[in-house]
């Protein structure tokens, strides 16, 4: 099967553009497209997330590792106690149980491909108490206050 890419809308033929999450997790201006949802011999899900300028993904952690490749634009990624600038083409490995978040805080869309196991644990949203502790790091404080 081939799913043709539409560069204008950053969508793929036959793939629905969905709300990022349905579980009331905190996020802003993020959509999700599931490009591949597993097969018997490839038990992974391949997804595309698009964050509008000023938006951000949920700050979370989980038991599973996942791989992310920046596909569009630039922004920043929080991983544990560090904040990194990311741009198109960058590959990111997010280890299990590492707090992480993506922000489109560079005036552009931030689109990324994400590979995870089909069978995986549920995310653990980083609590406001944990975020308050993390904000003691000036770089993380600036990241969390950025748009």
Predicted regions: what is each one?
Residues 55, 63-64, 82, 98-99, ...:
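A generic "binding-loop/recognition-motif" signal
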Residues 48, 93, 107-125:
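A short hydrophobic beta-strand segment most commonly corresponding to one strand
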Residues 1-43, 127-147:
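A short, N-terminal "cap"/entry segment at the start of jelly-roll beta-barrel domains
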Residues 81-96:
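Short acidic-glycine-tyrosine-enriched beta hairpin
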Residues 32, 47-62, 96:
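Conserved short histidine dyad/triad with adjacent acidic residue
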Residues 64-66, 70-75:
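Glycine- and acidic-residue-biased ligand/ion/polar-headgroup-sensing regions
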Residues 57-59, 77-78, 94, 100-106:
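Short beta-strand His + acidic residue motifs that chelate non-heme Fe in jelly-roll/DSBH
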